[in-house]
């Protein structure tokens, strides 16, 4: 719909993980926890998502966003399309409703987790310099399990 008045707003609350903030997207309903000292320098105009960056330097970033699955893509189609587009062999994993694809490009590690539903898609991408992989890997281990998709069976 063109009217945004009925759209729930984003929420930031205390996470069950100590020292973390829980972000819940008002439009798509997905949520993710991130370290308290990280900043949110970018919020998309259409309410689809945000960018979260390390306060110490912006080399470590978490992007989360949702989009409607208007093309009716399946999990396998989304996954294969991304791997093909990037064209880099990396780490992959998948479940019934999600996949993970992690690879290295231009000196950066990019870790993507995506939930694909018939109505909508929720995506999280964490990226960091290869030189900071110990910090980045630990961030992925802490943050990735907190990423919950909301209701992807419907469009938002």
Write out the residue ranges for each language-model feature.
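N-terminal, intrinsically disordered, polar/charged segments of Gram-positive cell-envelope systems
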Residues: 1-21
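Sec-exported extracytoplasmic/periplasmic mature domains
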Residues: 39, 80, 84-87, 145-152
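Extracytoplasmic/periplasmic, Sec-exported soluble proteins
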Residues: 15, 26, 30, 67-71, ...
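Stable alpha-helical elements in mature extracytoplasmic
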Residues: 34, 75-79, 136-143
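Signature of long, low-cysteine stretches enriched in small and polar/charged residues
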Residues: 77-135
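Surface-exposed amphipathic alpha-helical segments
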Residues: 121-156
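Short, exposed beta-strand/loop patches in secreted or surface proteins that constitute
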Residues: 13-14, 23, 40-43, 52-53, ...
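Secretory pathway targeting signatures of secreted, lumenal, and periplasmic proteins
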Residues: 24-74, 102-107
């Amino acid at each position: 719909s063109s009217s945004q008045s009925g759209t729930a707003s984003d929420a930031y609350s205390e996470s069950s993980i100590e020292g973390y903030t829980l972000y819940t997207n008002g439009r798509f309903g997905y949520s993710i926890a991130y370290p308290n000292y990280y900043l949110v320098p970018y919020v998309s105009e259409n309410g689809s998502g945000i960018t979260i960056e390390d306060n110490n330097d912006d080399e470590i970033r978490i992007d989360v966003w949702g989009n409607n699955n208007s093309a009716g893509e399946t999990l396998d189609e989304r996954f294969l399309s991304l791997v093909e587009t990037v064209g880099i062999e990396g780490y992959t994993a998948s479940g019934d409703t999600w996949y993970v694809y992690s690879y290295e490009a231009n000196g950066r590690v990019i870790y993507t987790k995506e939930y694909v539903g018939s109505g909508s898609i929720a995506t999280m991408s964490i990226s960091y310099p290869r030189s900071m992989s110990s910090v980045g890997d630990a961030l992925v281990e802490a943050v990735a399990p907190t990423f919950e998709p909301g209701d992807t069976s419907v469009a938002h």
